[in-house]
Amino acid sequence: MVRVFYYDEETGDTIDSLHPEICSKQKALSLFTVLSEARGSFFGLVDQNGNVLQFICLNDDKWRVDKPIPKEKGAYFCEASWNTCKKLIECIYDNVPIENYVYLEFELF
């Protein structure tokens, strides 16, 4: 079971990250598809193990992908296109390592 949180900078629509909602793969992809590409919009997933993957819009078709690792006091990250982000969302639902599709760098918080 995967849970979702998001915030749309243009519309103000949100699911709070403190209370993410269980969401099917199709619904998650649909929510991401209608999310505005306004700077500051974000979308996040929490997998069944509590791992978080979040996408923050930087500008049209440019997203920062973050995979926080609190015990390492940092996050793995990359920049990706909207289409790549959709593929990464599918990876979470299909239990496929996102590292198969993107190279992630590590940075401290």
Residue ranges, per PLM feature:
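Short, solvent-exposed polar/charged micro-motifs at secondary-structure junctions
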Residues: I15-S17, V52-I56, F109
